[in-house]
């Protein structure tokens, strides 16, 4: 798909940051080097649960170049929460504050007990290795089931159950039992890591006015400012956060990670710059993971394929600290409710502490796990009833005018039926399905399909606010200051398209300055929940309309015209009745506004808007694969995602988002799993050699298609797209493997080892 100059949304154009990235001029956090900068390295626990009885750091302190060593005794005794959620005035709804900068009571393999600061990174690493600690080990808990046992050792005061909740539309069990056919399933999903290209790094120093500046690879600069203030008990305004280019986050950097520690260290060392940079192994052990879910599901379906009701009982493993905690399990149940809204639905969930590395936000935020269970059960019902898997979904899919059964919120745009129909045609579903019947050999083909629903922000659970400030420069170009966060997803590019379309200028005349500095940009919580373009759009559009109004008013004075007769097209003032005849360039107008001795001034506009709508996006995955029974190997032949994300703002970027999500979904389905010893809690594969991810030879040609149905609640007709592409992929692959082999496998990932075990039980090998 060709990228070209654009003047509006709906057009493909080159990313505004493309040249900086391909030329190497883009600066990431680790590229920042300052005079006198020091480096910090952690001393981490080799055990998953216990206490540090004593610590000996004499050898480490004697090493030349070591400046300081801090232990749990030296840090503030202030528990804080790290989840990147908008702040709330309701104390009962705030995230659990169960973290300290360092701890004597270690709760997972790799927990931090001390930190070394040295003049160079190698010295800091060597000194950290020289710190000797005597440990008192405690019983290790690795599963929610063990955590909830009566005799389970408490990981935190208050017990191992972090939170539980129940949602229901009524007597769901009775509805399921009354249906013609019932299906049950027990589903398990693994602990996985985000594996973003850039590791976690933070750099902090103290300014002349004693304020702390932090440069960090984060999705949530303005939330980082708040949490650092809370962790160190200093005013939030005394913290300044600079976000340079970010090499991916996928939810991991929606947690406040190393910023509080970097800020603490510089404050203790007289304000010198201190960098805290994690290795890849540390990213596995000490950042965040995807929550492992155990789901017991029931579903009732009539013979004609009508879904009468379903229920899900979820156990969520949040690991050693709360992080995003129960919000993941709760959100997963809420988001899937839109998918098949005309049936009874019950969802109960418990989130438990264990001695695993902490789980947090990851692309899909609970929805991939829940959709895996729902779409597996529905597919099993279709098989048992002899109904085409696409047909059973079409009969139950959300449609315009339906409502979320839990909240009653109306669905104003629902393109799921159109996605299924379009996908069926592009994929040649009937032809491929017919080719996969009655197979007996070692190589067996199967096709599968799965659907999803996903919302466009966090409202009403979280406050959704966004700000935008537009300034016209002397040459007529426009600077856009936004509190939103570009982390590689292309947000700045679509923001420039929004402003260009609304004001009436080329995209090349718009420069977006997203949250690169919390001191100068308007407020916005950050990049998460597929919210960025949806929530930022109203503020951007409002400010753009106001700026356009000011520009035309100034032009009317210059041209002695009524403002009603003028408009802006491609950066030129024109008469509404003769748009093909430019009267004045925006540059000429800007020069007059700045330098005329009497009239004008710098033309600017600002807006801050809270969003109180949250429409669902929909879509589906079609997959064709081959299973080698003898080798227990799955090869994907073709995969297609079809999305209803409303108006597509930039087709080229949208395609890239979908392909990236599909690749992650394939990894979750077939390869990825953190292998954790069930007895010791030790992570056995905290590196990119032993942790298996799909590489280019493992991925087929990724295909995407879109159904554009305007969302009337949206400023530009669009809905979420960032996270949805990953959601249905694993379920579609599982369903295709079932068709190929007749074996329904309900535990991810579908590795050769797991396939061997399941095929052996089924008598295939």
Place the predicted regions along the sequence by residue.
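Short acidic, glycine/serine/threonine-rich loops at helix termini
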Residues: 79-84, 127-130, 195, 216, ...
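Short glycine-rich loop/turn motifs
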Residues: 103, 198-203, 294, 446, ...
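Thiamine diphosphate
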Residues: 249-277, 491-499
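Active-site-adjacent "gating/activation" loops or surface patches in catalytic cores
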Residues: 219, 457-479
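Glycine-rich loop/linker segments at domain edges
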Residues: 11, 17-20, 89-92, 161-202, ...
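Flexible, low-hydrophobicity surface segments
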Residues: 1-164, 182-185
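C-terminal catalytic domains of large/alpha subunits in multi-subunit enzymes
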Residues: 63, 72-73, 233-238, 267-275, ...
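Extended active-site and interfacial segments that coordinate phosphate-rich ligands
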Residues: 16-20, 129-142, 219-221, 226, ...
